[in-house]
């Protein structure tokens, strides 16, 4: 009724979630919170306050990292992790020896070398002017002795191989 005092029951309020900014180096790491996938870094998430959350960062070729995160109501925080790469040594032998090695499109020097590669799928290219380039997808495996042996063909060799042989009967 208008203009009359009324007694209403108390309305319980729930504490606001905490806001957490998650970052990783390198970026693009997958993130799970308490076992549930939540996205990729960098990502901003709200987490229930007053309890510990298990945040796990994982990215192909890197060691998994986990952090215990506890938020307070309406609190803002940042969690940043540097993921440790998992690498493997690979021996690359190339002919001609002065051909160039590219890993994922980046020049890494002469092709004939021992190199540390991330234990993830990588594109390896070996190039030299006047030769047919070589390209392959390669996954290095830690703990295994691995070698990639490549002999580039000259453009003339490739042209000769592409000529179809015709045999004429007379």
Please describe what each predicted stretch is:
Residues 1-170:
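Short loop/turn and low-complexity linker motifs enriched in small/turn-promoting residues
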